[in-house]
Structures are given as structure tokens and as C-alpha cells.
Amino acid sequence: MKNFVFISPNFPTNYWQFCRELKNNGLNVLGIGDQPYDELNPNLKDSLNEYYKVGSLENYDEVYRAVAFFTFKYGRIDWLESNNEYWLERDAMLRTDFHIKIGRAHV
């Protein structure tokens, strides 16, 4: 099964639909965010296979450890996205550090 890590899946609030469709298409949808799990939209909770709460998405080390945990538990990460312009550089760094080749432009 393919693994999709979604950074900050709770923002904007309608992104749970993206997670739902990924899950409906057979992917493990693994969320990383700084919002407590109990405060997530119920639709988002149902759309995620697992959620890892970090203290701050600004802390690269915390987010890195979250991706490492998912890699250990679920195997290779196939996609990593936030779909949020603010996190694009962070997404790219994580893709590089975890050798994630799918979901990025090849030059």
C-alpha cells in the first residue's frame, strides 16, 4: 500500500476532502500537524489512517521525527505534500531527506 504524508491536513478546513479521496483510492493517509487530535474535524479524523501531533510545524526536527516514525511503522513514504504555499520549502527538504521521488517535478 502506498503511503501519503499530508503536512497540516487541517488547514484549510476543507482539505479533509483531499485526504478522504486519497484514502478512498487505497492510500495510507498519514497526517502531521500541530493541532491536537481531539480538535480535528471528525471528517478529517475518518480520512486519516494516523495522525502525529507535533508541538510546532516550524520545528523541522519535530516534523522530521514524525516522518521517520511513519517510515518505521508503515514503510517507505511515497508522497509528502502540504498543498500549502507556506510549507513548500519544508516539504521539499523532507522529500530530499527521505528520498521521496514521487510527487515532485523531475528536472
Explain the meaning of each model-derived region.
Residues 1-106:
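ATP-binding N-terminal substructure of ATP-dependent carboxylate-amine bond-forming enzymes
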